[in-house]
């Protein structure tokens, strides 16, 4: 899918492979293919939708890492930390553009009607994902903490469930030429599974080990994300604890302030990188060193993040989140049971069923 005949853009296409070639779960294409095959569809029918989903996912990760100022992705530095924000944004944009081609190629394999339905589903997925991300960013921007669990679930449905669970299952069902009723039943299974998955991901962010998790431990606290644990802790904290927690969460993380981008400095840095006299990593270190020499507002400290984590443990918020995740998993099991009768007995159905136990047992 990556063009080999465009040498002038070789650097772009090389970076487009950066995230996909890192060790990952491959969850979205696996869901799409397993659903299609469990419904009697062919591997050929599911391959292109699955490839488009994986391209979209990696593009979303690049942009999400920039928006969240994340430092690690799949156990290695994020793309914007390695190559700078402008390059990373462009790589993400290119991956989104490239994801359209396999969807158009579908027409020659599954016909015009199913291909258009898949395009409609992907368009819905993109809109829901962007709205969910916007909702979370707005909560952080406004310092909004007057939120209930239902608000969190709604955000997760949009930001995570649509592109990670609902749409992969939906595309697999469409590729297998299933009717709307069965497709909707599978989508409900995927929705409940996705909510449980995201809650567990949030739990791992605070309790996992970086070697297994592959992302920054405690990153959600550094970024001030509204997770189920933080919302629960805020509801049960004393007024004094809550006020201090809100103050800490409103602070930027170290290095989050805009780095210097002087009109003379940037072209020089780019020239040094292009001539091989400075590595992309060295460029970023130089930018940060220059930024450190500038006066800064107060930033979060490790001690403050540790205080937030201690409050979460003190008020039983991790255990609460685990209980809620188990309830959503129970709903997913009920939804899967309703579908089980018309899923073909196969390794593909087994994979879908195995996800029910995997979601809460996973460590990354």
Which residue ranges define each predicted feature?
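All-alpha prenyltransferase/terpene-synthase fold signal
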Residues: 1-364
């Amino acid at each position: 899918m990556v063009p080999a005949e465009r040498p002038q853009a070789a650097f772009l296409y090389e970076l487009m492979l950066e995230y996909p070639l890192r060790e990952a779960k491959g969850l979205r294409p696996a869901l799409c293919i397993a659903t299609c095959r469990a419904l009697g569809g062919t591997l050929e029918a599911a391959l292109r939708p699955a490839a488009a989903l994986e391209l979209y996912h990696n593009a979303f990760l690049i942009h999400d890492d920039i928006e969240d100022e994340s430092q690690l992705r799949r156990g290695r530095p994020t793309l914007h930390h390695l190559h700078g924000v402008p390059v990373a944004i462009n790589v993400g944009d290119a991956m989104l553009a490239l994801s359209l081609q396999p969807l158009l190629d579908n027409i020659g394999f599954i016909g015009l009607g199913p291909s258009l339905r898949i395009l409609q589903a992907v368009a819905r997925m993109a809109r829901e994902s962007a709205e969910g991300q916007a909702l979370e960013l707005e909560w952080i921007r406004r310092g909004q903490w007057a939120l209930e669990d239902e608000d969190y679930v709604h955000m997760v449905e949009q930001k995570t469930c649509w592109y990670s669970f609902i749409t992969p299952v939906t595309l697999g069902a469409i590729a297998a030429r299933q009717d709307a009723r069965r497709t909707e039943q599978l989508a409900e299974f995927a929705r409940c599974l996705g909510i449980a998955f995201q809650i567990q991901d949030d739990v791992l962010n605070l309790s996992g080990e970086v070697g297994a998790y592959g992302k920054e431990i405690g990153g959600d606290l550094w970024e001030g994300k509204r997770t189920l644990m933080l919302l629960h802790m805020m509801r049960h904290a004393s007024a004094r604890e809550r006020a201090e927690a809100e103050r800490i969460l409103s602070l930027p993380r170290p290095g989050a302030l805009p780095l210097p981008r002087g009109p003379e400095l940037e072209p020089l840095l780019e020239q040094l990188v292009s001539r091989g006299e400075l590595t992309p990593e060295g460029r970023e270190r130089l930018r940060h060193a220059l930024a450190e020499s500038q006066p800064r507002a107060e930033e979060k400290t490790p001690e403050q993040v540790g205080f937030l984590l201690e409050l979460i443990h003190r008020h039983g918020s991790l255990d609460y989140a685990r209980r809620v995740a188990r309830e959503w998993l129970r709903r997913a099991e009920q939804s899967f049971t309703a579908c089980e009768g018309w899923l073909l007995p196969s390794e593909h159905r087994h994979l879908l069923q195995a996800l029910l136990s995997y979601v809460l047992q996973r460590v990354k």
